[in-house]
């Protein structure tokens, strides 16, 4: 595989991972906008499943050499910070 193709695959992989992370971030923001609702176990289960799936996608991309492990960690850390804000906002209410 030539360098140009490899770079293209790496860019596409990163775009897809960031798009999936953005979907999860939207789920988090929706929940933050509706904090008046009681805590929803189904919502939490969906969010946990999405986060786990994204972590598996990132591990796969790292193993293929499409992204650096540190970049994958940054993506997950960003989402975990948003989840922490959601948790803090909910428990402080």
UniProtKB/Swiss-Prot annotation:
Signal peptide: none
Domain of life, per lineage: Bacteria
InterPro entries: UPF0358, UPF0358_sf
Pfam family, one: DUF1507
NCBIfam families: PRK13666.1
HAMAP family with a match to the protein in the record: UPF0358
Family: Belongs to the UPF0358 family.
Name under which the protein is recorded: UPF0358 protein Bsph_1390
Organism: Lysinibacillus sphaericus (strain C3-41)
